[in-house]
């Protein structure tokens, strides 16, 4: 080896066909990645909604307890 990278000569038609197949594969990979990200986002959104609901419920309970304790003897 004289330090040069090996060169390969490919028929342009074959090269274009391979590039089209690679583009299709890339589109499928991007689609799957976006679906996975969307599912993760839905799970995170659900968890945040549950936490907000718990906090609001706790605040309402504390307000109820404090208001009801003011009117009892």
UniProtKB/Swiss-Prot annotation:
One of its GO terms (cellular component) is plasma membrane. It is a single-pass membrane protein. Pathway: One-carbon metabolism; methanogenesis from CO(2); methyl-coenzyme M from 5,10-methylene-5,6,7,8-tetrahydromethanopterin: step 2/2. The keyword Secreted does not apply. Keywords: Cell membrane, Membrane, Methanogenesis, Methyltransferase, One-carbon metabolism, Transferase, Translocase, Transmembrane, Transmembrane helix. It is found in: Cell membrane. GO terms for biological process: methanogenesis, from carbon dioxide; methylation; one-carbon metabolic process. Its EC number is 7.2.1.4. The complex is composed of 8 subunits; MtrA, MtrB, MtrC, MtrD, MtrE, MtrF, MtrG and MtrH. The chain crosses the membrane at residues 48-68. Part of a complex that catalyzes the formation of methyl-coenzyme M and tetrahydromethanopterin from coenzyme M and methyl-tetrahydromethanopterin. This is an energy-conserving, sodium-ion translocating step. It catalyses: 5-methyl-5,6,7,8-tetrahydromethanopterin + coenzyme M + 2 Na(+)(in) = 5,6,7,8-tetrahydromethanopterin + methyl-coenzyme M + 2 Na(+)(out). InterPro entries: THM_MeTrfase_su_G. This is Tetrahydromethanopterin S-methyltransferase subunit G. Signal peptide: none annotated. GO terms for molecular function: tetrahydromethanopterin S-methyltransferase activity. Its main location: membrane. NCBIfam families: mtrG. Belongs to the MtrG family. It comes from Methanosarcina acetivorans (strain ATCC 35395 / DSM 2834 / JCM 12185 / C2A).
């Amino acid at each position: 080896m004289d330090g040069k990278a090996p060169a390969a000569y490919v028929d342009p038609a074959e090269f274009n066909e391979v590039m089209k197949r690679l583009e299709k594969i890339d589109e499928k990979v991007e689609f799957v990645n976006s679906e996975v990200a969307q599912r993760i986002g839905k799970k995170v959104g659900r968890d945040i909604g549950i936490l907000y609901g718990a906090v609001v419920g706790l605040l309402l309970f504390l307000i109820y307890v404090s208001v009801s304790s003011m009117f009892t003897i």
